[in-house]
């Protein structure tokens, strides 16, 4: 006999289902469940007197016969491809199924077999996202990794050697010696990692040497001289070795203007960092480059979103990061040329239009490594408040009930798009079968601010945890702490290190004594803006050289700075 349960009681028991709506944190962003892969009346849930018990939701199947290692029950998956309710099956550190979990001996339509060897994680009432990817890291200190992990980031790509003056300014790990040491250091860090070599050279030999030493990409930075000759040489090496090139262009226009840089790039794929320009790049019009089909444009989070404090804080940050002297007028003028309210305001709107595809941190070098996801969804909130629903959301025949298209656009900026840009999307960047089980569980009220649980390679690596001497896990002080996957020999199989294919073919991991799985980056040279999910628009962008006003397809792009933001002091005391 069927039993009917009202919608609120159902959501409280099994999590929201199709048509239910959820607010993300304290923003104005409303998510609506698009589909439910579970079966009403056949839901699985763990606990005393509940379903996942021997002979009920738990089968007799062994692991050898197909039972999963872990099941996440009744999860609300938020990813670039959809917003769905489902059970998630994990096995051997990977996602093996998304659908309906249970016991196939007594229930039809089971996609995920629960057996005696299966652990259960309660996904009811939680949003599950892929671990975020921060593709603009200055590896200034190892403490960044824990801070990033605590925010929901599970992959970091960038360059550096520690707090060297070069690293403080540029995301480069220069030379084979330093790349080797950073790859060895990665062995003890609870994060997927990849390192960029220095790409600033006009001849190829030193760049090839770095790729063969394990660099997963090359970085062109103006502080090392991003000339047209260096751009052309670096891209030529990248094309031969299939690694990505990231670029911070010439703010002072000493070696050429933005037109010269576009000409030097020559239609080849390139990831442009802080494409608005406050983080560096041709003043005042580097932002134009986001309209090029071969360019993968990203932002760094200090300008995300545009607020009443954005301009003021940037000057001091810039002086410190780029080793400038406030007593030298030319250094001050250099800094001031990069900070323009008009282009920062336009950046908000270009993100909302899907013309900027990626958001990253610029960690400790004008960016905050623990705020990538927060700043991304603060930007989405600001645009919802100032610009209203996206046309795709407003076109909902039931009225503008949700912000699903906007939410999927912004989640893609910190997950799948940086993965595609850097050739690692076969392994990370989305909640899809076959991918590494790098997953983040959020309580909706804390979404984007403080994860409840971070799963890394199928094992829990970070979680909100109470007093270890308490009788139960929940008494305070509750805060994020590393879990067992971050320790001992469990760390290596839980994480990946990304290298060039050429380095792996020379047996570099064994030569360096690396224990972690070393994965080659692939398909970085044949992609373009069209491959950036939910963020592939190509407006014609123009900048007035006198007023710095930005136009896209002839329309002026401007917005007011935010006076206050969600996901801020309500959650964070410091």
Curated annotation (Swiss-Prot):
Q: Which Gene3D superfamilies match?
A: Metal-dependent hydrolases, Urease, subunit C, domain 1
Record region (Disordered): 384-403
Protein's cellular compartments: Cytoplasm
Recorded GO MF terms: nickel cation binding; urease activity
BP-aspect Gene Ontology terms? urea catabolic process
Q: Name one GO cellular component term.
A: cytoplasm
- Please give the InterPro entries that the UniProt record associates with this protein: Amidohydro-rel, Metal-dep_hydrolase_composite, Metal_Hydrolase, Urease_alpha_N_dom, Urease_alpha_subunit, Urease_AS, Urease_asu, Urease_asu_c
- One Pfam family name from the record? Amidohydro_1
Question: Coiled coil: which residue ranges?
Answer: none
Give the cofactors, semicolon-separated.
Ni cation
Q: What class of enzyme is it?
A: hydrolase
Cited SUPFAM superfamilies: Composite domain of metallo-dependent hydrolases (SSF51338), Metallo-dependent hydrolases (SSF51556)
PTM (free text): Carboxylation allows a single lysine to coordinate two nickel ions.
| UniProt: substrate binding residues | 221
- For this protein, what reaction is catalysed? urea + 2 H2O + H(+) = hydrogencarbonate + 2 NH4(+)
Task: Look up the EC number in the record and give it.
Answer: 3.5.1.5
Q: How is the cofactor bound?
A: Binds 2 nickel ions per subunit.
Binding, Ni(2+) 1: 136, 138, 219, 362
Q: What pathway annotation does it carry?
A: Nitrogen metabolism; urea degradation; CO(2) and NH(3) from urea (urease route): step 1/1
Task: Spell out the family assignment given in the record's similarity comment.
Answer: Belongs to the metallo-dependent hydrolases superfamily. Urease alpha subunit family.
Protein name in the entry: Urease subunit alpha
Source organism: Prochlorococcus marinus (strain MIT 9313)
Q: Which gene encodes it?
A: ureC
